[in-house]
Amino acid sequence: MDLQKQLEELKISTQEKLKEMTGNHTKELQDLRVQVLGKKGSLTELLKGLKDLSNDLRPVVGKQVNEVRDILTKAFEEQAKVVEAAKIQAQLESESVDVTLPGRQMTLGHRHVLTQTSEEIEDIFLGMGFQVVDGFEVEKDYYNFERMNLPKDHPARDMQDTFYITEEILLRTHTSPVQARTMDQHDFSKGPLKMISPGRVFRRDTDDATHSHQFHQIEGLVVGENISMGDLKGTLQLISQKMFGAERKIRLRPSYFPFTEPSVEVDVSCFKCGGKGCNVCKQTGWIEILGAGMVHPSVLEMSGIDSEKYSGFAFGLGQERIAMLRYGINDIRGFYQGDVRFTDQF
């Protein structure tokens, strides 16, 4: 067969095969390219026939070979684009989303049980006319201890192991410094001070089922004229009933805190057994929930408040303890370990 005719037939047959290829023929396209244009391909075999042509015909056929090679090379490149586009389109169609289908319900998170407890307690106090005041977690020794009637040589400082950053800077061991700063700024000509200060506090405790090196407190303070122990008891009675039920009673036991005088521990009648005695109240009928007392005159005087004219009461409770009592939780570490099997229960 004439070499020129073979070249034309190779061009035509290859072009026809290329037109039949779609997105599913990526491998076939590559195989055909090797078969036609490869080192051992059809076009290379035809080139070998040039040596048998006459000197006059050889340049003419050689030019035709180059033209066919260029045409087929371009054809392969264009068809490769067509095949790739078809492949992408097929993939898009197979992965398309039916927008008429109902959406998938996502798993939603919720507030942590300690956050829920804190917000509930804050709402109770807001309803009683208290203001919520935030403060610094990194605090000065002066506000954390000295302003709470705990000078540097006071033995009661041993009651709280402290994380010191420097000799004068520490992680607060209670939220009482917020109260000291607020008393400094309050204008008593506009009425009494009624505040709570919630937040994290830090003490050098060994973590176990009932202790943690960090936990949460809400401390409350009321300062004004003629504030009495009766006001404190009435406030605590209302708080206990709001948190644990309207039938709850409280009792006050003498205690000691450097910043209050007199000081008391506050117990609430057991909400599980109604005061009859059970494992929750350790057969006593009462559960300790917080500490409180009348603000020490020295604490008032350090804020420039006339202790002869003004008096006040203070109290402090822990959100973890309240939550543990309400929900029957026996290990405080569960609040901080991030185990959703625990947190999802609340």
Swiss-Prot record:
Q: Which GO terms describe its molecular function?
A: ATP binding; catalytic activity, acting on a protein; magnesium ion binding; phenylalanine-tRNA ligase activity; transferase activity; tRNA binding
Which cofactors, if any, are listed as required?
A: Mg(2+)
The cofactor note reads: Binds 2 magnesium ions per tetramer.
Give a single Pfam family match.
tRNA-synt_2d
EC number(s) given by UniProt: 6.1.1.20
Reactions mediated catalytically = tRNA(Phe) + L-phenylalanine + ATP = L-phenylalanyl-tRNA(Phe) + AMP + diphosphate + H(+)
EC class, as a word, reads: ligase
Cell location: Cytoplasm
The record's annotation in SUPFAM superfamilies points to: Class II aaRS and biotin synthetases, tRNA-binding arm
Q: Which domain of life is it from?
A: Bacteria
- GO BP, sorted A to Z: phenylalanyl-tRNA aminoacylation
Which PROSITE patterns does the annotation name? AA_TRNA_LIGASE_II
Nucleotide-binding as UniProt keyword: yes
Its keywords, alphabetically, are: Aminoacyl-tRNA synthetase, ATP-binding, Cytoplasm, Ligase, Magnesium, Metal-binding, Nucleotide-binding, Protein biosynthesis
Q: What is its main location?
A: cytoplasm
> Which InterPro entries does the UniProt entry name for this protein?
aa-tRNA-synth_II, aa-tRNA-synth_II/BPL/LPL, Phe-tRNA-synth_IIc_asu, Phe-tRNA_ligase_II_N, Phe_tRNA_ligase_alpha1_bac, Phenylalanyl-tRNA_Synthase, tRNA-bd_arm
Name the positions where Mg(2+) binds.
E261
Q: Name one GO cellular component term.
A: cytoplasm
**Record note on quaternary structure:** Tetramer of two alpha and two beta subunits.
For this protein, the record's PANTHER family field holds: PHENYLALANINE--TRNA LIGASE, MITOCHONDRIAL, PHENYLALANYL-TRNA SYNTHETASE
Family that this chain belongs to: Belongs to the class-II aminoacyl-tRNA synthetase family. Phe-tRNA synthetase alpha subunit type 1 subfamily.
NCBIfam families noted in UniProt: pheS
Listed name of the protein: Phenylalanine--tRNA ligase alpha subunit
**Source organism of this protein record:** Streptococcus agalactiae serotype V (strain ATCC BAA-611 / 2603 V/R)
